[in-house]
Amino acid sequence: MTAPDATIARKQHRTLEPYHGLVYFSAEAAAGYAALGVTDGQMGYFASRSAPLGAVPAEVVIATFYNFAEAEVRRCIPTAWALASPGDLLEARLDGIDGSLRRILGDEVIGATDVAEAAELAQRAAAACTPQGRPLCAGHLALPWPEPAHLRLWHALSILREHRGDGHIACLVEREVDGCEALVLHGAMGEVPAAILQSSRARTDEEWGAAVDRLQQRHWLDGQGRLTELGRSARQSVEDRTDQLALAPWLHLGRPGCDRLRQLVRPLSRAIVESGSFGFRPPRPPS
């Protein structure tokens, strides 16, 4: 059997991400948080995603989410915990993603044997995720496995996503790239407009400009804010190392299992993206 190389980790992430990430743009989840008193969309995002860690202080969310403006995190945390407990938010989150997946994919699709097979494969991969040095992954590993299969699949992909994300932050720290600098570098790649990255992470113009200045001093950006060859190489090294650190669960699953999981989840992710429900900002709850 041919073992996966590090690039398989990136392939898995790109295909599987919409199925997990839908929860952050779920109108059903936002309505559930609002019913608990968390009516602010950004607050719902911070609180629901960090809820597996418990009612943590703002500093923990700043550390683990990494690229969001500190002031925005402090606006939301710990205020959220006075409105709703982590346990209640986790329940609303699971109910919300259940509702969103049923609305977008339909009961027939989520009840199909393909989804059950995908859940089994994803759970097998997630079993190889270790908690050491990966706090968000560790929190999700401690949660009970939900049923039915479409929720088990979502939970497994959430563990795998946080495992990769925690590793990515470790790579950024090792290269001395702070959260705002990481956003600037991402924007300079041209894949996502810089303005969207800045606004979605609540970064001020002053913070953004200072990050650009620091990257120019390192010769990673030129005078027009474009990536230099040095900057492009540095960012690519972070992405490559992220893939390496994310590889363990995919090695455990093996190449045939990885390929099959992507094959099974690809049409689900495509349907989620095509539904228009996958975006850059948490939704506002319905009025």
Please identify what each model-predicted range represents:
Residues 202-278:
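Accessory, usually C-terminal, subdomains that scaffold auxiliary metal cofactors
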